[in-house]
């Protein structure tokens, strides 16, 4: 079957994602007053303008990437742009949050996986930090709603297209907690404020304390390379935990919590 046709048909359905029991429309039809036909008509009407905008964006991306690392690096960035954005669905949660959900295509179909969010984040941080938040909002909600009661970040929120709670059998406590705290700090760095972290401070504190207690010499845990299985004393996880604790200290400093910042920065060191 034609994958492009399948992708197009996916956007015809009125409610594509089930999010903790609520069936959500795609973002382009979040109010329920659009049709795929109206979108095709809009695309036809705006075709020349959007193609011009696309060409200008492509040119800018290649120029900036070439300046940063040369032509071969720029070509990798062009590939990475598509790769990082593929297999995501943008919806609006009932509480108004943007939610940008990934799908694992060649493993188990998990939706909203944190260790997929993390490596794709640099692209979104550069072009649209609000989309980084949108890749994190569902994980924060999962914990803060009480639906996920463990003291570390969840791995995912279900199996696409059902985002009703983690279905993957193996937690990644240090991996995902570290990822979430580091990403919160990256958002603060880019935006020049820690407002997003402040909104989720209690949850970030819980996850960071888990990293302090369990991250330096991790026990038998999975990491993002889960095909390797569980193993202890994972140096990569240890580094992830250290960076997570340091990131929390950085956020605390931005929020004026000087004693907290000093405490956690020293723990990271």
Q: Model-derived features: where do they sit?
A:
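Conserved acidic
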Residues: 97, 196, 233, 260
């Amino acid at each position: 079957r034609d994958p492009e046709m399948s992708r197009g048909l996916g956007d015809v359905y009125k409610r594509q994602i089930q999010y903790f029991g609520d069936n959500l429309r795609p973002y382009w039809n979040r109010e329920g007053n659009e049709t795929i036909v109206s979108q095709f008509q809009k695309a036809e009407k705006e075709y020349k303008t959007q193609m011009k905008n696309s060409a200008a964006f492509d040119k800018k991306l290649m120029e900036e990437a070439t300046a940063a690392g040369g032509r071969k690096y720029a070509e990798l960035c062009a590939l990475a742009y598509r790769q990082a954005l593929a297999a995501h669905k943008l919806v609006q949660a009932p509480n108004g949050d943007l939610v940008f959900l990934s799908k694992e295509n060649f493993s188990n179909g998990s939706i909203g996986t944190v260790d997929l969010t993390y490596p794709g984040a640099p692209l979104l941080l550069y072009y649209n930090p609000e989309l980084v938040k949108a890749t994190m909002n569902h994980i924060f909600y999962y914990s803060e709603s009480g639906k996920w009661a463990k003291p570390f970040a969840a791995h995912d929120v279900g199996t696409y297209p059902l985002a009703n709670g983690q279905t993957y059998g193996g937690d990644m406590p240090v991996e995902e907690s570290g990822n979430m705290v580091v990403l919160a700090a990256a958002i603060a760095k880019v935006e020049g404020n820690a407002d997003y972290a402040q909104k989720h401070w209690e949850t970030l504190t819980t996850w960071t304390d888990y990293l302090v207690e369990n991250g330096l010499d991790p026990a038998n845990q999975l990491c993002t390379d889960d095909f390797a299985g569980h193993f202890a004393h994972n140096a990569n996880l240890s580094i992830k935990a250290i960076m997570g604790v340091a990131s929390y200290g950085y956020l605390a400093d931005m929020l004026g919590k000087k004693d907290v910042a000093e405490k956690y920065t020293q723990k990271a060191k």
